[in-house]
Amino acid sequence: MKKTIKFLAIASSFAFLANVANADTFIRMVSGPSGGSWYPLGAKIMQTFQSKIKGTATSNTSGGGISNVMSVDGGDAEFGFTYAHTVANGYNGKGKFKKARKNVRYFATLYPAAFQVAVPKNSKIKGFEDMKAANISPGKPKWTGTAFCESILKDYGFNFDTIKKNGGVVHMVSYKESVALMKDGQADVFMAATSVPQASFIELENSPGIRFIGLPKDRIDRIVKNNPGYIYGKIPASAYKSLDKDIPTLGIVTSAIVNKDLPNDLVYNMTK
């Protein structure tokens, strides 16, 4: 059985290399982290491009909303997922971008996403004001969810440095690692800007059990006003079994981007 599996793996590798060797065009995609919705969606899109666009080979690697804009702009990828406000900030050199990313072009608006925040079900943390000395897991650097967290903490009058000075920890890790930290009791808060529902939160609902934290309307009003591209969002009660009411939060729009140097006819075929 092991020999059969090994043979199939080798055969698949040769088949992929053959596709690349025979391809006229190679589309490299940067999507999202393992455990999130972007990675499997990106894999499916790349599979579709390769099967439907003649002479095309594709690849899909993990990434994040901010880093994906940098990768596509820098020519390390031709296609990527991000958020509408993130690509706008990147193009104009604002927010987390130290320089304008002018090689990026908007490809498509996909679907809304929400900023989701969860704590263990028996946690004493009721809101962001209780996180000043907590162990939080907001995502990796250059991820949009991490930037979301920073925007919210700023409105509450503190930041990551405050948490660290107070004895807390800011875990800059992946969804998978965040789930492990929550299960082991090493993280008090898990945050992610992603689709609803999301697999990592569903897993944590089952074990050890979680409670979602929302934002007061006045906070959402102010943060949306101060951060163009942020929108009003919610986690519907129907999304997770532990919810009995909607959770008000911030929202964003998931988008796809391409490098400006892609041929027009190729981009047109990709849209189809």
Which residue ranges define each predicted feature?
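Pocket-lining segment of extracytoplasmic ligand-binding domains
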Residues: 84-86, 93-96, 123, 158-263
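Extracytoplasmic small-molecule ligand-binding "clamshell" domains
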Residues: 37-44, 48-72, 79, 242-244
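Sec/Tat signal peptide C-region and signal peptidase I cleavage site
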Residues: 16-23
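Short beta-strand-centered segments that line the small-molecule binding cleft or hinge
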Residues: 88-92, 103-109
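Short amphipathic alpha-helical coupling segments at ligand-binding clamshell hinges
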Residues: 263-270
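Bilobed "Venus flytrap"/periplasmic-binding protein-like clamshell domains
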Residues: 24-57, 113-184
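Bacterial N-terminal signal peptides that target proteins for export
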Residues: 1-9
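Extracytoplasmic
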Residues: 24, 54, 64-67, 74, ...
